[in-house]
Amino acid sequence: MCSSDLIGVVAPKEWDAIKASQKLKVNWTQVSDPFVDMNQIYDHIRNAPVTKSDKNEKGDLAAAFAKAAKIVEAEYEWPFQSHASMGPGCAVADVKADGTTTVWTGTQKPHFAAQGVAGCLGVPVEKVRAIWVTGPGSYGRNDAGDAAADAAVMSQLAGKPVRVQYMRYEGHGWDPKAPASIHRGRAALDAQGNIIALDFNSKGFSRLETNSTEAEPGDTLAGMFLGHKGQRTQAFNLPDNAYTFENKKLSWETVAPTLAGPSPLRTSHMRDPLGPQITFASESFIDEVAFAAGADPVEFRLRYLTEPRDIAAVKAVAEKAGWKPGKAGTRRTRRGDIVTGRGIAYTQRTNTIVAMVMDVEINEKTGAIRVPRVTVAHDCGLIINPNALKRVIEGNVCQGLSRAMHEEV
């Protein structure tokens, strides 16, 4: 079946559809603007023109840096990453002759998916009913909504209910990606090792190149190939923490997408929308500044926190982990080829405070990394379902470790 640039194979049995799709021979027109070489992606981001920017600034950074006893600078890189849910997107759609449509989907926002499906089908949204069913997970904006739109278009063409189940390589290849980005930190220290100014900038592809709501047909794969235009909003994020520096500038900049048209390299929200990227970089930088100041990483963070809940979370995780005060970089111990260290990170998101201490072992001979213990302080206010929260925390730890070590695409 073919509608505009959307091609699909429908068969009574899944394996028959797979075999038939593998035998298709399709001639595509080559686009004029190819992908950036992934080996050059960070240089591309550094040099690309800025499409949009925003900042949060207070104090006089220029004066503070001019009188600094020491200046610390660092840069961090974050690659494109797939949402990589436990299973790729799947949906079932039943489009009747009069346009009445039912879609069964595991997307995070079925109400918005119904709007996107209606746009792809050219029917009023009142005719579309989206029923949420348990899926493999939805982490920001994965491929679940795309599967719903694909199934609906195929059902409309076939005149029968259609189930779309992406192959694993399709899910990894075509789902919206976490945007690649670079993050630069610059801090001014006085003679006592205190931060008197901090400048932190993130630059990368937009977190809303593909809108996370799926409400517009152009923000779904099917809609893109049917010729619909997406919203293509330019946006990134600022670090989400409560550090109080007298002089501070937090800023972000976005660059244009690598392709202007339908593309398998679409960028969108990753988890909270960009918490992993920004927290990784901003907290790594706080550690580097603590090291330059000769300070303990826990004590150094507490210097700049004033909110009771933030302070309590950092203190609680340090106590539970058995944190022993000492200069940053001095916790390394050795047992044969195994070097052990520990670190702390803290962040907040929508009034939830999280602090974490992680013990890490590295085999210097083989390069193998092992994390024997993770301690988490998680203050989200009133807890309604302790078991669900426990799973959220454990899932965050597992996914964070996996993304840190394995999931560049």
Listing of model-derived features with the role each one plays in the protein:
Residues 383-398:
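Conserved phosphate-binding loops in nucleotide/dinucleotide-binding enzymes
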Residues 1-382, 406-409:
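Structural alpha/beta core scaffold segments of enzyme domains
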